[in-house]
Design a protein with these regions (language model features):
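Perimembrane helix-loop-helix junctions
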Residues: 6, 187-219, 230-231, 244-283, ...
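Signature aromatic-anchored transmembrane alpha helix within multi-pass, membrane-resident enzymes
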Residues: 30, 409, 414-457
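Transmembrane-helix signature of polytopic, membrane-embedded enzymes
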Residues: 31-32, 137-160, 202, 208-218, ...
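Short helix- or helix-capping micro-motifs
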Residues: 36, 154-159, 186, 231, ...
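Transmembrane-lumen/periplasm boundary regions of multi-pass, lipid-linked membrane glycan transferases
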Residues: 59-74, 78-81, 85-114, 118, ...
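Transmembrane-helix motifs of polytopic, lipid-linked glycan transferases
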Residues: 124-145, 183-187, 358-360, 364
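Membrane-interface alpha helices of multi-pass inner-membrane proteins
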Residues: 210-238, 340-342, 385-390
Length: 548
């Protein structure tokens, strides 16, 4: 009994509460963003000022031509605005104007608006917007699947997606449009997963006038308005992102399908109101950010600019293959699987590409089997982009960029779904009991992360070395004599030979000197000028040839 009393008199040990470390997954997104930043900002000046990308070169010329308006009233004046490329000689401009406005004003702020400067500003802006897309794919995964780890893995895949890395090294409008698109998709996910106010069946119904329901009831109107604004920004960045508009009513339908039947009547009215207001706000934002799609000159002068429509129609004709242009001939006889093949092999890399495509098929099957409320938004967006671009005449990899973050999310979902399905799925292999599904999930995760990292590192290594055509050209200039050759002696004793062009019909005389502007390759001493061959005219009908 004494022993029993001693036991009873012992103080009870306090049970420790488990430490909540779920926050660490949210903090690790910073690490993922730093990884993505390294891939995107390494070697931004990869072509060392040669402007090798044709679309980027065009945008660079446009950027150096436009300039901020002196008065705010000039901004909407399509015929006179200094921000309108059409007024400055670029009459075929089919890109969104919001990205060039952003880059130009950032360049003004940094004092980097010259031809050899503004494209680097544009590349940095492009990379920064893609980092924002990575953040939103993390938020989408965390919100949609209630799993921060799933969102983090999706963000890591997106950070290492090679096409996203490549586009971030170009000054183009694609990353800006993609950022606003995925910000809008995140808002759409928030709408479809929103919870309605709890309904008490015992409570007496209260009559609320229609006007009060329309103007005073919430109904998640803020989310709809944010989506509308983001869609307007995306459309003003790239008009071909128009399919994004369908995701808002789709999110509303999914939200509506989850409501109790006795509350759907009131909610449907609010949903229609929200959709209309979101559409109005989208139009207003587009009017502000793509002002020259309208004639102006005032904000309320919203007659469509037919010159802008004509440019879009011309682009559509070229993209359809109806007109033969040299740069579109490459798309002839391309199979319908061409875009998908390039996405898997090059854009994502084989491990991530295969996993993403497998996850896409699996998610589609889950959607058909009844799990559509969770998957239809992301899967439908991915399927629409993949199908339409695969059937388009121009099947450029860049046109599939809007589905890349979604494919990364789907690949991450496939890994976690496989792990989830592995609960209890134990098989005996010889003397070992193996949960083969979870083992497969781990193998898939390790192989995909390692493969994607290796592919991203190998690709980014391109930007740390001279571009081959630039290196070859510099070797030619250095080792093969030109019409005019300038030996430039450096302090280290090495001589740099710079060749200059010379027009074969030009004449040298005291009265008519040959003038040629160039930038010296080295800031050192010019030791001479070599003319490889000169024809000296000493009479009207005779010439003598003298080597220089």
């Amino acid at each position: 009994m004494n022993g029993l009393n001693e036991v009873n008199n012992k103080p009870l040990k306090k049970t420790r509460k488990p430490i909540n470390v779920s926050w660490i997954w949210d903090v690790l997104i910073i690490v993922v963003l730093l990884i993505g930043a390294w891939f995107r900002f390494t070697g931004l000046d990869w072509d060392t000022g040669y402007h090798l990308h044709p679309d980027e070169r065009f945008l660079t010329m446009v950027e150096t031509a436009i300039r901020p308006v002196e008065h705010l009233s000039d901004y909407f004046s399509t015929s006179t605005s200094t921000l309108n490329p059409n007024n400055l000689g670029y009459t075929f401009y089919v890109y969104g104007t919001l990205p060039i406005f952003i880059v130009r004003y950032v360049g003004e702020w940094l004092g980097q608006t010259g031809y050899d400067q503004i494209h680097l500003v544009g590349r940095a802006v492009s990379g920064a917007f893609d980092l924002g897309t990575i953040l939103f794919i993390f938020l989408i995964g965390r919100k949609l699947y209630k799993n921060s780890k799933l969102g983090l893995l999706a963000a890591l895949f997106s950070a290492m997606a090679v096409l996203q890395i490549q586009i971030s090294h170009y000054f183009t409008v694609d990353n800006v449009a993609n950022f606003f698109a995925y910000a809008a998709i995140y808002v759409a996910v928030c709408i479809m997963m929103a919870e309605s106010k709890p309904h008490n069946p015992d409570q007496e119904p209260v009559f609320i006038p229609l006007w009060k329901r329309l103007f005073l009831s919430g109904g998640h109107i803020g989310k709809y308005l944010v989506f509308g604004a983001l869609f307007g920004l995306a459309l003003a960045s790239k008009v071909s992102i128009y399919a994004l508009a369908a995701l808002l009513p789709l999110a509303a339908v999914i939200y509506y399908s989850k409501l109790p039947k006795d509350t759907r009547g009131n909610e449907s009215l609010l949903i229609w109101r929200n959709l209309v207001l979101a559409g109005i706000l989208a139009f207003i934002v587009f009017r502000i950010c793509q002002p020259y799609a309208f004639l102006g000159p005032g904000f309320f002068d919203i007659k469509i600019n037919q010159a802008w429509i004509a440019s879009l129609k011309e682009l559509a004709t070229i993209s359809s293959g109806e007109v033969d242009v040299p740069y579109a001939l490459q798309w002839a006889r391309r199979p319908i699987t061409f875009a998908l093949e390039n996405l898997v092999k090059w854009g994502l890399g084989i491990p991530l590409g295969i996993l993403g495509f497998f996850g896409f098929l699996w998610m589609g099957w889950r959607t058909i089997k009844g799990d559509w409320q969770k998957h239809l938004l992301i899967w439908g967006w991915t399927a629409f982009i993949l199908i339409t671009q695969s059937m388009n005449w121009v099947r450029s990899m860049r046109y599939l960029l809007p589905l890349y973050p979604a494919m990364c999310l789907i690949a991450s979902w496939a890994i976690f779904k496989l792990w989830e399905n592995g609960a209890g799925a134990v098989r005996k292999i010889t003397t070992l009991h193996v949960n083969w599904r979870r083992l497969l999930a781990v193998i898939a995760a390790v192989v995909t992360i390692a493969g994607s990292a290796g592919w991203a590192l190998a690709f980014t290594n391109i930007y740390t070395k001279p571009v081959t055509r630039v290196a070859a050209s510099e070797w030619i200039y250095e080792n093969i004599s030109g019409a005019i050759r300038l030996p430039i002696a450096g302090e280290d004793g090495k001589t740099v030979h710079q060749s200059l062009a010379y027009q074969n019909t030009a004449t040298l005389s005291m009265d008519q000197p040959y003038v040629y502007g160039f930038i010296a390759q080295a800031d050192e001493e010019l030791t001479g000028v070599t003319l490889e061959h000169v024809l000296f005219s000493y009479s009207l009908d005779q010439t003598a040839s003298y080597p220089a």
